[in-house]
Regions:
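N-terminal Rossmann-like FAD-binding beta1-loop-alpha1 element of flavoenzymes
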Residues: 3-30
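Short N-terminal binding/cap micro-motifs at the start of the first secondary-structure element
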Residues: 14-16, 37-40
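Glycine-rich active-site loop/strand segments that organize a redox cofactor
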Residues: 46-96
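Short beta-strand to alpha-helix junction loop
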Residues: 69-77, 96-115, 125
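Core beta-strand elements of the Rossmann-like FAD/NAD(P) dinucleotide-binding domain
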Residues: 1-3, 143-147
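A conserved short coil-to-beta-strand element within the FAD-binding core of flavoproteins
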Residues: 126-139
Length: 147
């Protein structure tokens, strides 16, 4: 399969990355070894998903490249994700120090991310183990255990 973007891992960051790339017109494939996506999301926050923190700020992250964090958080803030949560009518509450949790189940966040991926026409490859990634002149080749 040919794609403009291959995202390895269908966790929260992987699904969000795939969704945004797809919605920006890229052909995206999202590959995960698990057959059921979002397992870590499903168990986070005791099954209620701690989906963001209102107090996220660049000075609260350690990085070899502090400019990356400043840029990333300036372009997509916790408020942006909260707006998406509200568009999907997911009830939430603040538990402690800006930590936001679903009132219901973490499944709601997984469903939100799946729908955002669908809106970007993301192709799914679940139950697929990545054997290696190879740099080639045209980009990268992702070799799976099925190749």
């Amino acid at each position: 399969m040919r794609a403009d973007v291959a995202v390895l891992g269908a966790g929260a960051a992987g699904m969000m990355c795939a969704a945004v790339a797809g919605q920006r017109g890229r052909r995206v494939v999202l590959i995960d070894h698990a057959t059921r996506i979002g397992e870590k999301i499903r168990i986070s926050g005791g099954g209620r998903c701690n989906f963001t923190n209102l107090h996220s700020a660049p000075d609260r992250f350690l990085s070899e490249n502090p400019a990356f964090c400043r840029s990333a958080l300036a372009r997509y803030t916790p408020r942006h994700f909260l707006e998406m949560v509200q568009r999907y009518r997911i009830a939430w509450h603040e538990k402690h120090r800006g930590q936001l949790f679903c009132d219901d189940s973490a499944e709601r966040i997984i469903e939100l991310l799946k729908r955002e991926c669908e809106a970007g026409a993301v192709q799914w490859r679940t139950g697929t183990k990545v054997a290696r990634v190879e740099k080639v002149s045209a980009g990268f080749l992702v070799h799976t255990a099925l190749d």
